[in-house]
Structure formats: C-alpha cells, structure tokens
C-alpha cells in the first residue's frame, strides 16, 4: 500500500463522518395491530363460543408474574375478567364460556383435546386471515359439541410490560372467527395502561367492547 493511501485511510479512521457509520441491528418487535372495538349488534341473539386464554408473556421486571404457577394464575384471572366484561357489556349475545367448553370436551370421550390445549395462541399473528389446521378442525368440532355457535371469540395472547413511569401496559390480542369456515372476521390488539395490572387490563378490555366498534362481516 502506498504512503498516500495509508495516510488517507488513517485520516478516515480518525475523523468522524468520513466513513459511513455502522448501525446496530434493531431488536425484533411485536407486530402492531389496530385497537378495533367489536360491535356486538350483529351478534345479538346469537351463540358465540369463547375459548380460554392460553398464553401470557410478562416482563421479568413485573413482580409476581414469573414461573408456571404464576402464569397459570394470571390466565385464570384474565379469563374470569374477560368473561365478566362480555357478560356485563354485551348481555345480548349468548356467550358460551370455557367451563362449558371443557365439559363438552370431557363428554366427547377423548375425541377432542381440552380447549386449553388446542393451540389457539397461534391466532396472535396479525398475518393470519384464516384459522390454521388443526385448530380450525378443533374449533368446528368444539362448537358443534357445545351448541352449534356460528362464531368463536379467541383471546390469543396477553403481554404485560412495565413503563418508565411506574405504570403497567397490558395488551390483549383477540380475534373473532367464523367457526365453520375458519375465516377471521375481526381482530384487535387491545392495550391499556394503569398503576396496577388490574387497572391496565380493565382499560384494555374497555377498548374491545367500544360503542363504535366494527361489526363482523356477514
């Protein structure tokens, strides 16, 4: 290498801005989805199956949420509040909740897995326009055993994250599917913020049953 080229290279290394800066690889982020409320006017008088929540992801900085036992407790708690919110804010819909679904699968004599083990957390992906197999088949058989509902409401996944202002953000991915065809009729990523996990979750649920929600397509 010539003396001139060595001097140019040395200058480039010492003086900022001569060589292009190397960007650090960005961290993978959860796909964003719009928080769209579900209008229940089009569901009035109809039976809608509600599957249980099976996935919760909590930041390790949130106390009391780590480990299988804590996650199981959060799932039961979140399901209970979700079901209560549906009954309180949309009593015009004939909701079929997870306890009834569990009894139905028990009566099936092993033909269907428990509704807690059907793999419905896959529906958290915002790219899915249809329910994939084998979940599609499970849901179709499940609603047939539990009364023949046309739609299935699936709370797919829940995320709990702390903020820098000592509050918590709870996000809930939920979809409404046509139980017969598997088509996704409605999807939301409901988000709420609060001083406690309960406050944040209640705020998230309030966005799901908004008065100006979008009715499912026929």
Sequence positions of predicted segments:
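C-terminal/domain-edge helix-coil "capping" segments
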Residues: 22-60, 78, 118-119, 129-151, ...
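N-terminal segment of the mature soluble domain
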Residues: 63-149
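N-terminal hydrophobic alpha-helix used for membrane targeting or insertion
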Residues: 11-12, 167
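Bacterial N-terminal signal peptides that target proteins for export
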Residues: 1-9
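Alpha-helix initiation/capping motif
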Residues: 5, 97, 195-199
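Histidine- and/or cysteine-centered catalytic micro-motif in compact active-site loops
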Residues: 8, 101, 158
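Hydrophobic h-region of N-terminal signal peptides that target proteins for export
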Residues: 12-21
């Amino acid at each position: 290498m010539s003396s001139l080229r060595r001097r140019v290279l040395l200058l480039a290394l010492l003086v900022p801005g001569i060589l292009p800066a190397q960007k650090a690889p960005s961290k993978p982020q959860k796909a964003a989805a719009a928080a769209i409320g579900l209008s229940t006017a089009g569901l009035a008088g109809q039976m809608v199956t509600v599957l249980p929540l099976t996935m919760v992801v909590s930041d390790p900085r949130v106390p009391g949420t780590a480990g299988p036992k804590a996650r199981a407790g959060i799932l039961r708690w979140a399901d209970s509040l979700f079901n209560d919110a549906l009954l309180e804010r949309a009593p015009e819909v004939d909701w079929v909740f997870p306890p009834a679904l569990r009894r139905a699968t028990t009566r099936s004599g092993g033909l269907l897995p428990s509704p807690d083990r059907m793999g419905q957390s896959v529906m958290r992906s915002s790219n899915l326009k249809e329910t994939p197999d084998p979940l599609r088949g499970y849901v179709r058989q499940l609603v047939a055993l539990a009364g023949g509902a046309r739609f299935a409401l699936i709370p797919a996944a829940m995320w709990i994250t702390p903020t820098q202002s000592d509050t918590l953000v709870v996000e809930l991915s939920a979809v409404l599917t046509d139980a017969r065809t598997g088509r996704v009729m409605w999807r939301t990523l409901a988000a709420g913020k609060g001083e406690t996990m309960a406050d944040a979750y209640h705020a998230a649920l309030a966005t799901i049953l908004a008065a100006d929600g979008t009715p499912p397509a026929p």
